[in-house]
Amino acid sequence: MSVPPLLRPPSPLLPAAAAVAAAAAALVPGSGPAPFPAPGAAPAGGISFHLQIGLSREPVLLLQDSSGDYSLAHVREMACSIVDQKFPECGFYGLYDKILLFRHDPASDNILQLVKIASDIQEGDLIEVVLSASATFEDFQIRPHALFVHSYRAPAFCDHCGEMLWGLVRQGLKCEGCGLNYHKRCAFKIPNNCSGVRRRRLSNVSLTGLGTVRTASAEFSTSVPDEPLLSPVSPGFEQKSPSESFIGREKRSNSQSYIGRPIQLDKLLMSKVKVPHTFVIHSYTRPTVCQFCKKLLKGLFRQGLQCKDCRFNCHKRCAPKVPNNCLGEVTINGELLSPGAESDVVMEEGSDDNDSERNSGLMDDMDEAMVQDTEMALAEGQSGGAEMQDPDADQEDSNRTISPSTSNNIPLMRVVQSVKHTKRRSSTVMKEGWMVHYTSKDTLRKRHYWRLDSKCITLFQNDTGSRYYKEIPLSEILCLEPAKPSALTPVGATPHCFEITTANVVYYVGENVVNPSSSPPNNSVLPSGIGPDVARMWEVAIQHALMPVIPKGSSVGSGSNSHKDISVSISVSNCQIQENVDISTVYQIFPDEVLGSGQFGIVYGGKHRKTGRDVAIKIIDKLRFPTKQESQLRNEVAILQNLHHPGVVNLECMFETPERVFVVMEKLHGDMLEMILSSEKGRLPEHITKFLITQILVALRHLHFKNIVHCDLKPENVLLASADPFPQVKLCDFGFARIIGEKSFRRSVVGTPAYLAPEVLRNKGYNRSLDMWSVGVIIYVSLSGTFPFNEDEDIHDQIQNAAFMYPPNPWKEISHEAIDLINNLLQVKMRKRYSVDKTLSHPWLQDYQTWLDLRELECRIGERYITHESDDSRWEQYAGEQGLQYPAHLISLSASHSDSPEAEEREMKALSERVSIL
């Protein structure tokens, strides 16, 4: 087939650029219609004219092809493309064959002259695009969907059968045209009735000037056959790349697409008589929505009505409103296409679901939540310039089973087991208005515009400008009290209303000018910011800001009474108890700064009022749990009180009220999961993984020595002390932790399913080897960016199949030692699973560079707890044998430490831990 001519609307560039652009485009092999022109004068042999569609007029340029001829077919293609982009709701299947072109001829009696051949079009003509009478009503109704695999964060339902889309990721298909959602099993049954509302754009906006978009499409557009190889969308859709319609979105050229039912079947069904539905009461075993009102069918059984012919589901109250459009039982090749049919239909796939190379920003954009395999994308991109593949061959290829070279596992993500907690807007203004005050250092009463947010009180010069007089951070407020007699009050001055006490100054706020026995003279209005009522509202607002996370329904007042209401006790890590201490007097909690959430509570950022030290405060709502579980709520505190190790997060203290428990811990930089997802490839290099895993194992060794099993080990619970490339890590979240002896077993439900060992999932007894399984999963997800197991298959079967556990992408880049360690940790039989010390002795972790990195970390933090002095001579000898440089400062450090009694004591303690574990 000859190279088609280029169709481009003119753009305001220089004539020289026009010739260069046109020549370059003409030299591109296999290039299709390039929608945007090189500007200025038309190239030799080119014809510039206008296409008019209704009230819209677009300039285009028709160039000669390689044979020197013009093609009317490409004028039609350009017209279809303009219709699709400017009037997507008006396009339909087969538009190309159902349009006529007329040339405006003012000199003729019949102004519109039918264009039969391309030579009828002259320079500067106005060509009218008219819909042929052969376009039937059925043509307008047939609009195929553009279906792509999609991952949902919120519960979603199939718009065909009404049932919920199940799974963690890739639960179903979303149409790019209309945004509807479907099961994969329903894709072959849904009618081709896409509305295309998501693709619509204003029809009065000219396409001229969008050169970057249209030019880009020219690079990808080839001679498009009548039946596209991928999902058959309306004619204009298949002639352009996705980047044309969705600027800035991820290209879907290599994503998995699904084809709906044959268009011929839709034409056949159009001729069928539509009759009323035959509804019968139905009991649903899965969550299902009414297909009329799109609301959930509630109840345990007999939730709604279902048509016994077409399986349409609805509420009883909605049945009278449902249109009489039942087509009965629709079958093709003996397969029932009604929504309720559960038959497994083989899908036609446009390309492989290549997702072993994960994007670090998984599902950040809900509309573009697909992930692609980079290697396969490059391979397909190289073959894209070649000749078109045989459609039948592609169809046979698409029906094959998934290749072991690609991973079908769940991509790594943050697993939340509790109610979804949204992050509140930062610095939200809680109250603002005029207020007066004086201080313990300056008795002159001043008036400012106060603005209270979640972190501070700002005293502005006026209510509109940005200049301010002073900031009072809430974390520095030590006390908020009603007014007391003060020697600083000037003689004869009106008293203040309440006091704000900080470490350096006391603010006397408000002016109590109105006494109960008198009223303002001449009934005059008080100046803004003056009066007891205004001051009282400010006092309450500040009290709420000081203790922002309070139980629902509890009232917060000021003064000593409120302290007695919400204060019970404080339990410090040294087990001392102080009665009637309010957490808001010691710490400021920032409700905007949500650090994390789990099954037992939410973690907020906070600050110690006197020292200004940053802390993390976990708030546990006791009202969410039955009385029997209250002991479990204190489990984390009880364990952390007895743990003092650099690899475990430090517990500062614990407060408790009748409704809540406040656990105050040291605040760290972030977590390991964030580090994995934010890395360049969505996974960590081996040397960083070794560095982190060694620290985790050392902390676990200390826990197991104390007979403590974490039971919920995952990257979210491994915190980073800094933003360094090689940070110190600490274990946190001991809410599931258990005291388990060396040979003891427990059966209680613990942990996060994605990281749990099989014995827990099967309700069998477990021991401390449970944590070692979790370490194996952490190593796997760190190196690959995916979870090791597919949710649809048995774990034991998947472990036996190495081809699916370790697909070449990315495991061909990872050492065999790492895979060997993972295999020894992911052992279904507990007795075969590696222990902590055996894991630390594995060749993958016995690495010289890792040892050096860990020693540098210990030097940086000033404490040696990861490596041991007994290994120094071994690694120094290894460096000499391999010709590697051994850091001189480590030699001097090891010599000085070996002579100290503290070093001997630490050595004996570490030795006793190892012996106890072994």
Curated annotation (Swiss-Prot):
Post-translational modification: Phosphorylated at Ser-403 and Ser-407 by MAPK13 during regulation of insulin secretion in pancreatic beta cells. Phosphorylated by DAPK1. Phosphorylated at Tyr-93 and by ABL at Tyr-469, which primes the kinase in response to oxidative stress, and promotes a second step activating phosphorylation at Ser-744/Ser-748 by PKRD. Phosphorylated at Ser-916 upon S.enterica infection in macrophages.
Composition bias, Acidic residues: 345-355
Catalytic reaction equation(s): L-seryl-[protein] + ATP = O-phospho-L-seryl-[protein] + ADP + H(+); L-threonyl-[protein] + ATP = O-phospho-L-threonyl-[protein] + ADP + H(+)
Outcome when changing residue 744 to D: High basal kinase activity, loss of phorbol ester-stimulated kinase activity
SMART domains: C1, PH, S_TKc
Pfam family, one: Pkinase
Cofactor section: Mg(2+)
GO cellular component, one term: cell cortex
Superkingdom classification of source: Eukaryota
GO biological process, one term: positive regulation of autophagy
Zinc finger (Phorbol-ester/DAG-type): 144-194, 276-326
Gene3D superfamilies recorded: 3.30.60.20, Pleckstrin-homology domain (PH domain)/Phosphotyrosine-binding domain (PTB), Transferase(Phosphotransferase) domain 1
Residue list for modification Phosphoserine: 203, 206, 217, 221, 351, 403, 407, 454, 554, 744, 748, 916
Listed EC numbers: 2.7.11.13
Active site per database record: 712 (proton acceptor)
Domain PH: 428-547
Binding site for ATP: 595-603, 618
Transmembrane segments: none
Region (Disordered) residue spans: 338-362, 379-410
Annotated family: Belongs to the protein kinase superfamily. CAMK Ser/Thr protein kinase family. PKD subfamily.
Protein name per UniProt: Serine/threonine-protein kinase D1
Protein's organism: Mus musculus (Mouse)
